[in-house]
Amino acid sequence: MKNIRNFSIIAHIDHGKSTLSDRLIQATGLVSDRNFQDQILDNMDIERERGITIKSQTVHLSYKAEDGQTYSLNLIDTPGHVDFTYEVSRALASCEGALLLIDASQGVEAQTLANLYLAVEHNLEIIPVINKIDLPSADIERVKKQIEEDLGLDSETAVLVSAKEGTGIDALLEVIVQKLPSPEGDLNAPLKALIFDSHYDPFRGTIVHVRIIDGKLKPKEKIRFMSNNAAYSIEESGFFEIERASRPGLLAGEVGYIIAGIKTVSDTKCGDTITLTRNPCEKPVTGFTEAKPVVFSSIYPVSSDEYVDLVDALEKLKLNDASLIYEKDSSAALGFGFRCGFLGLLHLEVVQERLEREYGISLIITAPTVSYRLVLNDGSKKIIDNPALYPDPTMIDYTEEPYIKASIIIPDRYMGPVMKLCMERRGINKNYQYLTSNRLEMIFELPLAEVIFDFYDKLKSITQGYGSFDYEMLDHRKSDLVKLDFLINFDRVDALAQLVHRDNAEARARKTCEKLRESIPTQMFKIAIQGAIGGKVIARKTISAFRKDVTAKCYGGDISRKRKLLEKQKKGKKRMKMVGQVMVPQAAFLAVLKTENE
């Protein structure tokens, strides 16, 4: 056990975590240069296309150190985006140490701080690593100063590397072996293993990712999940060496996988403890706090025939994405579907893309919302995350919406535009402080609903990419909210309903009506699109009807003949309008999202 090192790489987005993982894998000779490809641990197409890590990935490396001993290194590459913090915290629970990666030109950013606090919470040994030292804009002395002042770490221990060029990788491996502690655990105690992730294999069932805390396990042994007492027999165990590599067993301190023919997807829960049936441990491992969803949206299959496939796909995706929460939902306009909770808008996009790509299901996604707390006239409280469930306003005493504390780190020359952006989003300026002579941390309290759509994108464009943003949830606060309904041909479409602040309601209604007009195809009759609060219409757009030229066969002659044909056409259209149902395409629901992004 003394030769095992379990560690994660944590950093802000784009500071080079996956590239550093690539170099460590190459330096230890796990993959030959011929078979190597960049971002080797990012095995989803969507990760490669976007150039981001979404899933934490584990890899087992063998390293022969300068002292002549061979060490087992278990590396977990983590995501950097604020939406995937839950992935990071789960990875850290399986480690004793962390490499805190900092870009030599960008310096310490918001997620650097957030990830440092996470690592400190888990009592990890932290090694600061300054990456991208090959860049012309690299300022190593400035970053060392930030490590001392902003992070409170010893900058003398910082390792200088260029993951792209491969500089300093051997020195880093030596520091990992010397500085990081080996895992603690009792090899002779009853088996206690923490599930920190899992994924589904169509041939082998659920593959469980485990960190062995105490004891040992080997194939053919009977195991039990402590949260639900489900029992299975181990078929295979081993390490992740990019692909699965089976081993005759796993020992205390090791990180690996087990396959036990688990076909019931719901039996495997992240944070659960595995023990042996014949000799169980007394107490489970302290797991993870449940991920709290921040953004809610409904997902419906475009074709109702795909509903059963969607149920199956969500179950399997939940295995691999523990922060996804969902429950059954139905809509008069869209049929049966699911109300899902996500950690942010990027998380929503990724889930949508994975469902469509990996499971081949065409989806309709409704506009994302947050959860609101309603205090009714009788004093009772109700929490809703779906605008369609908003009760009659006369029953509501007041409404509360969630607020966040946002930490925004920017160069001070962008202070004015960022302040303006936050004020436009109903922000409250709480504090600001200079981190260095020209870098500023601004603290704002903002309504979550104003942030979930495009706040981060706007911040990045205002600050030309130099702004970074992190947030934590605060409380619910009183707010003047109204339910905005949309009517198409005087029929309410529940899936288009939104809860908005009264001051923004009219502008939002106009924009949405305009977008709907652009995306609903022209019909044989006139279509009215209305935005309304209660019974009061506050915005309207009209889609004109197709008009067939019924007078084409009249050559000259009396005008009354033409008039008669036109009147006849009008009557036919009137009748058609009464029975005509307007088909609302997927594009119209997406249009509501687009409105938010403008």
Regions found by a protein language model. Give the residues of each.
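Structural and coupling elements of P-loop NTPases
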Residues: 1-598
